[in-house]
Swiss-Prot record:
Pathway: Cofactor biosynthesis; ubiquinone biosynthesis. Its main location: membrane. This is 4-hydroxybenzoate octaprenyltransferase. Its cofactor is Mg(2+). Belongs to the UbiA prenyltransferase family. It is an enzyme of class 2 (transferase). It catalyses: all-trans-octaprenyl diphosphate + 4-hydroxybenzoate = 4-hydroxy-3-(all-trans-octaprenyl)benzoate + diphosphate. It comes from Nitrosospira multiformis (strain ATCC 25196 / NCIMB 11849 / C 71). It is a multi-pass membrane protein. The chain crosses the membrane at residues 20-40, 43-63, 92-112, 114-131, 135-155, 160-180, 209-229, 231-251, 266-286. It is found in: Cell inner membrane. The keyword GTP-binding does not apply. Catalyzes the prenylation of para-hydroxybenzoate (PHB) with an all-trans polyprenyl group. Mediates the second step in the final reaction sequence of ubiquinone-8 (UQ-8) biosynthesis, which is the condensation of the polyisoprenoid side chain with PHB, generating the first membrane-bound Q intermediate 3-octaprenyl-4-hydroxybenzoate. One of its GO terms (biological process) is ubiquinone biosynthetic process.
Amino acid sequence: MTLTQRLVHYEKLMRLDKPIGILLLLWPTLWGLWLAAEGVPRLDILLIFVLGTVLMRSAGCVVNDYADRNFDGHVERTRTRPLALGAVSTREALLLAAGLSLVAFLLIQPLNRLTIELSFVALFLAASYPFTKRFFAMPQAYLGIAFSFGIPMAFAAQTGEVPFPAWFLMGANLLWVIAYDTEYAMVDKVDDLRIGIKTSAITFGRFDVVGVVLCHMAFLAGMVAIGLLQNLGVIYYIGLATALGLILYQYRLIHDRDRARCFKAFLHNNWVGATIFAGIVLDYLVRAAS
C-alpha cells in the first residue's frame, strides 16, 4: 500500500471526508463560547476550540470504528470502513486515536486549570461512548453528554467557571443529540436489530418518529429558556423560529422511515445548529451596535 493510499484510509477512518460530525459537535460549542463571552469571545480561545473539536471528533471516530470493527462488516452503510475492510490495522487505529488525543490535550495547555480538568472528562466520554451500544438501551443519551461537553469547557475557558446556564444549555443540547442521532440510527435499524446493537431507534420502537419530534421540541423549549436566562433579544428568537421550521421539515423526511430520507434529515441538523448560532451572533452584534 502506498503512502497516499494509507493517508486516504486514515482520512476515512477520521471521517474527514464526512465533516457533518465535526459540525454537529462544533455548533453547540460555539453557542456556549458566544454566550459565555456575551458575544465577544477571545480569538485564541475560539481557535483552540475549533481545532480541538476537529481533533477530538476525529479521535472519537477512530475509537468508534475500533469498537465496532467486528460489526461494521455486517451493516450495509459501514461495511466499507477501513477497519472493517482490514485496510488499517487495530494497532494503527489505536495509535492514531492516541496521537490525535495527545495533540488536542497539548492544544488546550494555554487555557486555565478548570478547562484542562474538564478535558479529562470529555476524553473519557468520547472514548467510552462506542462501547455503550452493547449494553445501554439509549446510547444516544450518552453521546449527548459527550457531544455537549464542549459547552461547560467553553464557559470554563472564557470565564473561569461553569455557571447554571452552561449546564442548562448542555441539557438542552443533549436532547438535540438524541433527536438527530435517532434519525441516524433509523438508517441502520434493520441491521442493528440483526446483529444485536442497541440504539434509541430500536428502544423507541414504533414510536421512533414521535421520539425524535418530542426531543426536538424539548430542545427548542430549552433554547427558549436559555434566551431568557441570558437576556437575549428578538433576533435570537427569530433564529429559533427558523430552526423550528427546519425541524418540521425533518419530520416530513422521516415520517415514512425511508433510509435515505432519514439520513437526509440527520444531515439537515447542521442547518439547525448553524441557524441558532447565527441568531446568537447577530443578536449580540445588533445590541453592541445600538
